[in-house]
Amino acid sequence: TGTNCRATVDGNYIDNCFIEWSNEHDDEPEFNSEFSFSQLNISNNIFLASHVAPWFSYIILKPHGAGHFINGLNVQGNFFRIIGGTIERVERIDTSFADTNFSRMRNITWRDNMYNAVDVATVNPLISTHSQETESDKWIVSGSPQLPFGGWARKVEALVAEGPIRNAVNVKRYEMPYVDLAQGADNDTIHVNWSQPVRGDIVISMRMDTPL
């Protein structure tokens, strides 16, 4: 129930329960030049639940005041499984009192987890393959819905072509594109920009946070 919790949840069997991270005991819960939600490690746990509603989640962030963000979270090496149905995703933000500031998310690692009967396998950084079949000078690559907490596409760590990039007359292009971050109505897409309309395949690694 504190933001800068300095806690590790490691090696547990978590049966029909969830982790809720809140600041409900803060008498001034709005963000005010502090660390915000930080220093939480959730690793190597077995999460199991049965016959739950599709909106059930195992990891819930619940800010009780406006302006907060995540400033250090590691979720790695966990098993997530549902019996007797499926759930939409394993994590969510409870906005009963306030939402979070997605533009300030920082130092979030969410990887090497395993999912069964979960619609969306969350990961950060997200490695995505994009195939552009028709020539365009702007390729739109979405990070939704796999970025944690429905986060913004805020950083690109790497971008590489898988095979040749070709223009409308089938000539190979060797240029390096540039990207526009946090695009679209939900800020969850990347625009990959070229000097001319081209087609091809790329692999892109994107994040919903600012890494250290």
Put a short name on every predicted segment.
Residues 1-211:
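Extracellular parallel beta-helix/beta-solenoid repeat domains
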